[in-house]
Structures are given as C-alpha cells and as structure tokens.
C-alpha cells in the first residue's frame, strides 16, 4: 500500500497529499540563516521542523532519492553593519557565525542538508536571472538599482492571500522616488561609498550586490532546477521574501510553477512576548548550551507543539521537556532494547502534517506500557518502541546511564562508593550512611543490590 503523507500547503491553504514531481528525485529547499549574529531559539525552531520533514521524506522515498538544499545568506546589509560594529572583516564574521550555526544545529541533533550553498558563491546565477527579467520587461534599471516590477507579475498576492495595499502597510520602502511603483523591490543595488569590496561584486549594472530575494531564487534554480517540490521557512517569510521569490522565478522562467508545496512554521515567543534584544529576552542557542541544557531537551521542546502553531519558550516548558525525556529514559533502563519497525500509529501521526504532539503522546503511552507490563516480553516490546520512535524524531541518542549521569564526576563518585563499601565491610554503618547522605545532597541516589553491589544514578 502506498504511503500517503498529508502536508499543509500555504499556497492552497489546505492539507494536500504530498505527491512529488518525481519520486526518485524529491527536491526540497529551505531558507537558511543570514550569518550576521549567533542563531537564536526562534531560528532553531525552523531548522528542527525541516529536519523532521527531511527525515519523514527520506523514510518514504529513500535517502538517495531526496535532495535537501538549505542556503547560507552571507551577503546582506546586516552583515556589513555587524562586521563594522565588531571591527572585524566580513569574512571573519560570516565564517565565525556559520561555524556557530553548524555547532548549534549539531547540538540540536539536526541532520546535514544534501547541499548548503553560500550566496556569495552564486552571484553569476543571480546576474543571469536578473538579465532574463530585464529582457522580459519584468525588471528595470533606475538610479543604478535594478528593480522588479511587481505589477508585471501574475498572481503576485497568491501566497499571502492579501490585497496589494494591505500587504505593504507598515513595510519600509526604500528609494521610492526612483521606482515605477512603491511596491517594486530591489534585485541589484549599487555599492555605497567606502563600502567593503568583498561584499560587492562586478555586474552589468556596476559594482554592487544582490537583493535578498534573488539569492534564494538563484540557489534553488542552480541545485533543484526551475521546478521543485517543497519550499520551507518561517511564517514571517511568507511576505515579502517568499512572495517575491515566486514572482521573480515564475517571471524569469514562464513555464515554471517554482515550488509545488509551501510549508511554514509558526512564530516563537519568550514568556508570552515577542523575542527582542530591547526587551532583554533574546535567547541564543549558545545561551542554552552554556546553561548545560541538553540539546535533546531543547529539540523535544521545539517539537512539543504542532509546527504551524505559535510556541512559547519559558522555563516550565523546558522543565517539562526534561521530565518527559527522563521518563522515557527511565522506561528503557536495564532493558535489552532493539530497533523495530516504526509502529504504524506513530508513523501515521507524522504523516498527518507532522503531528508531533500526537507522536510525543504515543511515545509517552509506550513508556507507561513499560511500567505496567506484566511480562518481560511485553516490557521489552514497549521499550523497543520507545527507542525506535524517539530515534526517528532525533531523540534518545544516549544510553540511560549517559543521560542520567551527564555532567557527573564518575571517578569522584566511585571513590566514595569504594570508601562506603569498605565502611560496610567493617560494619561502620555511620560512615556508610554519611557517604550516602553526602551523595544524596549532590543529587546522587544509591541503590544497594542483594548481591552486595551498589548502583547509582543522578536524581
């Protein structure tokens, strides 16, 4: 029986059965980071969501049949401003932030994409597309800029489903006097006086750099062609970024539909408020790493809500994710778990528009099953289902011992256990109890076994 994967398509505003153009070459593009500053927790939600989508598509079609492209935006006004503020070169900044991004995503258990192109390495493709747009009267030159003529694009408002005037309310419009229409957007901009040379490039329109939107159109075209299956990103990218991508790509390649399925994840708030540096609630992934919060805890938190719904970061949500993982790891402790086929109900939850809250509940049910199992066989089956399901969504990649004892000085504990064992041999029960209580204060729980051995775990 053919697997049916239902995915919400922003373009049609309905859940559709995912049917790629070629099942042997499934193509997926996701907007990656602009590498001007360390990734924050909101950025990481997008990466984790599309990491899960990638895993599901691989499961259905096979790893060799899926090409996942996630770009690096390393040319942008924010990068120039940030490098100047830090008194470092642009290359130093982009290299440092790109490395930090990779470290952060490894911490969150994300797979690497098939290809990770950098914008600065694809200027020639951007120029090629801009030239096509000019030749087809969809773009024009004004005041050393190249602009896209928004009114020349059929169905410009299709993705956002809003009228043109409403879409541009509150949007800052630059160089409006030089444009045909206020809504037209930049495809190429000239270098500013005294601006860094390595952020600008030669072009038919002079020395300058591309606008943001043309970058993704160029890189998706280079690696996936005129048409591909999935385009993902945060809901904040629906307009203007993704709207403008569609317009310029379809106009440059008139026979193209560009991306077939548009997938967008919801916003992330912090304690109910929008995250911003001015509010002092700007949380980077590095902040969480420095607090020694497990990447698995953060990943589970990010998957705890449906990807299209808003998600609020707060201490309780992180504590709840930690307790859930503790429960799962405790359930498989001292059981010979084996990887099994993904349980049908678990896979069906993910095939229904990536319903991760239901998937997490199903794993919880298997954990409950372990604790109420009447036979060892039943216990092992439930525990094996836990590890199989959790591994599939990028969780539980440690042993229970590693999980419960991370950050613990095992040498120190074992020395105390040896002292306690010696005290017990000499019937010095007072010293033995003192050592137990000392470890308990450090949240280390001891369990004396009938055979005389003692095992320990972190509380």
From Swiss-Prot:
UniProt-annotated binding residues for ATP: 277
Sample GO molecular function, one term: cysteine-tRNA ligase activity
InterPro entries: Cys-tRNA-ligase, Cys-tRNA-synt_Ia_DALR, Cys-tRNA/MSH_ligase, Rossmann-like_a/b/a_fold, tRNA-synt_1_cat_dom, tRNAsynth_Ia_anticodon-bd
Cofactor comment: Binds 1 zinc ion per subunit.
Catalytically driven reaction(s): tRNA(Cys) + L-cysteine + ATP = L-cysteinyl-tRNA(Cys) + AMP + diphosphate
One GO BP: cysteinyl-tRNA aminoacylation
UniProt entry keywords in alphabetical sequence: Aminoacyl-tRNA synthetase, ATP-binding, Cytoplasm, Ligase, Metal-binding, Nucleotide-binding, Protein biosynthesis, Zinc
Any Pfam family hit: tRNA-synt_1e
Localisation: Cytoplasm
Residue ranges of the motif 'KMSKS' region: 274-278
EC number(s) given by UniProt: 6.1.1.16
Sites where the protein binds Zn(2+): 31, 216, 241, 245
Residues spanning the membrane: none
Similarity remark: Belongs to the class-I aminoacyl-tRNA synthetase family.
Assembly and interaction partners: Monomer.
Name used for this protein in its record: Cysteine--tRNA ligase
């Amino acid at each position: 029986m053919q697997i049916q994967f239902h995915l919400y398509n922003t373009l049609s505003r309905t859940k559709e059965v995912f049917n790629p153009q070629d099942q042997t070459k499934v193509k997926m593009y996701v907007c990656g980071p602009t590498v001007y500053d360390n990734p924050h927790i909101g950025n990481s939600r997008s990466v984790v969501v599309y990491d899960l989508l990638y895993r599901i598509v691989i499961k259905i079609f096979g790893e060799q049949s899926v090409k996942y492209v996630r770009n690096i935006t390393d040319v942008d006004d924010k990068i120039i401003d940030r490098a100047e503020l830090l008194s470092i070169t642009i290359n130093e900044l982009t290299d440092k932030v790109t490395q930090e991004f990779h470290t952060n995503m490894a911490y969150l258990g994300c797979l690497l994409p098939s290809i990770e192109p950098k914008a600065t390495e694809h200027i020639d493709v951007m120029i090629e597309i801009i030239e096509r747009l000019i030749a087809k009267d969809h773009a024009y030159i004004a005041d050393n800029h190249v602009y896209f003529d928004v009114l020349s694009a059929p169905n410009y408002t299709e993705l956002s489903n809003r009228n043109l005037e409403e879409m541009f309310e509150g949007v800052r419009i630059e160089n409006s006097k030089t444009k045909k229409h206020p809504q037209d957007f930049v495809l190429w901009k000239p270098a500013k006086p005294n601006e860094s040379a390595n952020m600008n490039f030669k072009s038919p329109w002079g020395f300058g750099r591309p606008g943001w939107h043309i970058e993704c159109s160029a890189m998706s075209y280079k690696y996936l062609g005129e048409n591909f299956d999935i385009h993902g990103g945060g809901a904040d990218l629906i307009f203007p970024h993704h709207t403008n991508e569609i317009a310029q790509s379809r106009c440059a390649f008139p026979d193209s539909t560009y991306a077939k399925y548009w997938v967008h994840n919801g916003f992330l708030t912090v304690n109910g408020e929008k995250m911003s540096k001015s509010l002092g609630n700007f949380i980077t992934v590095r902040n969480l790493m420095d607090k020694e919060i497990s990447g698995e805890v953060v990943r589970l938190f990010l998957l705890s809500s449906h990807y299209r719904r808003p998600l609020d970061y707060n201490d309780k949500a992180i504590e709840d994710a930690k307790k859930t993982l503790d429960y799962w790891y405790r359930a498989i402790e001292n059981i010979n778990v084996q990887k099994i086929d993904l349980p049908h109900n678990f896979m069906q939850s993910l095939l229904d528009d990536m319903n991760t809250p239901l998937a997490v509940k199903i794993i919880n049910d298997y954990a409950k099953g372990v604790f109420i199992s009447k036979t060892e066989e039943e216990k092992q089956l439930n525990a094996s289902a836990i590890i199989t399901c959790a591994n599939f969504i990028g969780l539980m990649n440690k042993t229970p011992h590693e999980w419960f004892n991370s950050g613990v000085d095992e040498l120190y504990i074992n020395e105390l256990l040896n002292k306690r064992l010696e005290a017990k041999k000499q019937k010095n029960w007072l010293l033995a109890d003192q050592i137990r209580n000392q470890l308990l204060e450090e949240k280390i729980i001891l369990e004396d076994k009938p055979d005389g051995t003692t095992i320990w775990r972190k509380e």
